[in-house]
UniProtKB/Swiss-Prot annotation:
GO terms for biological process: signal peptide processing. It is found in: Mitochondrion inner membrane. The active site is at S47, K91. Belongs to the peptidase S26 family. IMP1 subfamily. It comes from Arabidopsis thaliana. GO terms for molecular function: serine-type endopeptidase activity. GO terms for cellular component: mitochondrial inner membrane; mitochondrion. Heterodimer of 2 subunits, IMP1A/B and IMP12. Pfam families: Peptidase_S26. This is Mitochondrial ATP-independent inner membrane protease subunit 1b.
Amino acid sequence: MTSPSSSFWNTASREAMKSGMFVAKVYCFLHVTTNYLGFMAYAYGPSMIPTLHPSGNMLLAERISKRYQKPSRGDIVVIRSPENPNKTPIKRVVGVEGDCISFVIDPVKSDESQTIVVPKGHVFVQGDYTHNSRDSRNFGPVPYGLIQGRVLWRVWPFQDFGPLGPTPT
């Protein structure tokens, strides 16, 4: 025969276990989704004007294509910064492996240009607003391994909600 207090504790422990399992399932779902399928990225600053607003954008990026195909010219990608791994800038791919890229090193200060060949396993990324962008002109070509995902959609600001596909460069 069970006492009323032990019945209460049995019921409470069962409910706690159910709740704990639900929380664990939600956490696992979110972990798999954000680490393997897609994620939300926040972009702010002037480096991608006119494509992105300098005051801030919420973007939907996917991680699947980086596993099965190489980035293409014109793709907007989220990268892990080669200079500061805590930052994830958003830039446009302007050159893929084997491309010969000529660029002005610092368009604000001079018109000195440089030409490089993008090495195998790398991409050359650049902000759309080259006068105010820290990109491959500063830190060199980016290895594929630092690409976190490809941007698909702008989610916020809502009036500009929609796809952000590649544009010719």
